[in-house]
Amino acid sequence: MAGERVRGIGDLIREGERSFSFEFFPPKDEAGEEQLSRAISALEPYRPTFVSVTYGAGGSTRDTTVRVTGRIASETSLTPMGHLTCVGHTRDELTAILRSYAAAGVRNVLALRGDPPDGPGTPWTATEGGLRYADELVALVKEIGGFSVGVAAFPEGHREAESLDHDVAILLGKQRAGAEFAITDMFFRAEDYFGLVERGRAAGVDIPILPGIMPITNLNQVKRMAELSGREVPAEVVDRVAAHDGDPVAVRAAGIAVAAELCEELLAGGAPGLHFYTLNRSKATLEIFAALNVTV
């Protein structure tokens, strides 16, 4: 694969007017497979720039992630990207997984360090014979060749970063290792995203940074997810959505409105696109698209 030229996601983002993309997770059972298929079918007509498939903690979904991403490559018109983490794998195992992706027709990878084996907030320990950080995984992907590679970015800073500037320095290191684009963790204030971009550009980060959008359809669920990342949903967002507590329909509508307004502000401010965390459901994303007057 070394030396092959891939028209990857980084190129697609730079070439297009704006990018829309969706994230899915590997289903655990037949019902989950059906739900994912429905979501993909509903969102495919919107011609996303790409779709991504997550990688379970400690490599727990390794085979499923490769299989699902490969199916998207072979059975749909979509450009798939597989996630890959350092956690629980040796360098040789990571190389084998990348070759499995290539054999399945997947040529885009999101390279992540991953959460510590004992869970978010616990000390990070690399696997013996493995890699320590995402920039090392990016370098391995580029060494193997034939892939376009993206990385994560953090508008509010990674929980382990010493400061926001330190966090940007880490992103710059991933770019220097070969990353072609970045996708942010979820956030709820446009100023957090634009602050990241400003700090990044000042430090020399010039790859596209896609904002990651998490629609709030269940406030408690999203609050738990934010806590796992070491942050909180902003009080103004919580108050706006929680004002409808007891009325699930109204809670959902308020959450969708919050996300749609955020998306409008991001696009108006020059964000290169939007990456939606779908949780394998299409309805919330389609409702946001309707609010944005997105056409296909």
Residue ranges of predicted features:
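N-terminal amphipathic alpha-helix/helix-capping segment at the start of soluble metabolic enzymes
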Residues: M1-F22, D29-E30, E34, K142, ...
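Glycine-rich, positively charged N-terminal anion/phosphate-binding segment
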Residues: G3-G10, E33-S41, Y46, G59-L78
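Active-site pocket-lining/capping segments in soluble small-molecule metabolic enzymes
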Residues: G3-V6, E128-F154, D206-I256, E261, ...
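Conserved, mostly hydrophobic/aromatic
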Residues: E23, V51, Y101, K174, ...
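Glycine-rich, proline-tolerant flexible connector loops at the mouths of alpha/beta enzymes
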Residues: F24-E30, P48-V68, P116-E128, E180-Y193, ...
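Glycine-rich anion/phosphate-binding loops
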Residues: Q35, C86-A103, E128-R132
